[in-house]
Amino acid sequence: MKELFELINDNCKYVVLRNWEDVYNEYVYGSGGDDIDILCEDKALFIKLTGAKRLHGNIFRDNYFVAFGRLKVRFDIRWVGDGYYPTKMERLILENRKQTEEGIFIPDDKEFFYSLSYHALLQKRSLSDKYLFKLQHIFNSTFPNPYVLNEEIILNKWKEYLCDNQIKITIPNDPAVIINWANVKKLGYEKNIMRLISRFWYRFILRINSRLKH
């Protein structure tokens, strides 16, 4: 795994979006383990360098795996312009990235706060205590004059961020990514008809398949 990251470090602009502390731990990310969440500038280049293969037949899904001998490590490969985050935000994350002592590129503290809070508030059905605790820790160490966070306060921080950077929330290209519509509508979003249709059909087919199995 270390050799893989050394290769992409030299050839491809990327970050590991979260949970990078255990990236080299095969018990966490080995076969059947967690996914490594990647944001890269050039998805085709990342796939070419790593030899990543699709996990699913659906071309809109961004789930891949890379084989390391007997291990198959799963990657969720996000890329600039895919709507997983707003495009301008994806560029900011990559432009402001930093490198860990282990040689892995990750978001800087400010972009990590916003990327993780986006994931926790807009890509989960509800804000969990686990994410709130982590966001509070990042907030305390990153922003001046920190205070106690809750969902409403984080959404207000997001309204400021969107206004300051002239960004709109986007619909992800990957139809399997959860959208918390209640929170998305509070912030407003950039409408993309094709992605909404793709999402509708993906959910429809899932329901049909589920009924057929029963």
Give the location of each predicted region.
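Catalytic cores of NTP-dependent nucleotidyl/adenyl transfer enzymes across multiple folds
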Residues: 79-197
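Active-site nucleotide-donor binding segment shared across nucleotidyl transfer reactions
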Residues: 1-47, 214
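Short secondary-structure junctions
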Residues: 11-16, 48-63
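Conserved catalytic core of two-metal-ion nucleotidyltransferases
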Residues: 54-92
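Short, low-complexity, polar/charged sequence segments that are solvent-exposed and flexible
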Residues: 34-36, 57-59, 93-99
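Glycine-rich phosphate-binding loop of ATP-dependent small-molecule kinases
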Residues: 187-214
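Low-complexity, flexible helical/coil segments
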Residues: 49-56, 73-75, 110-117
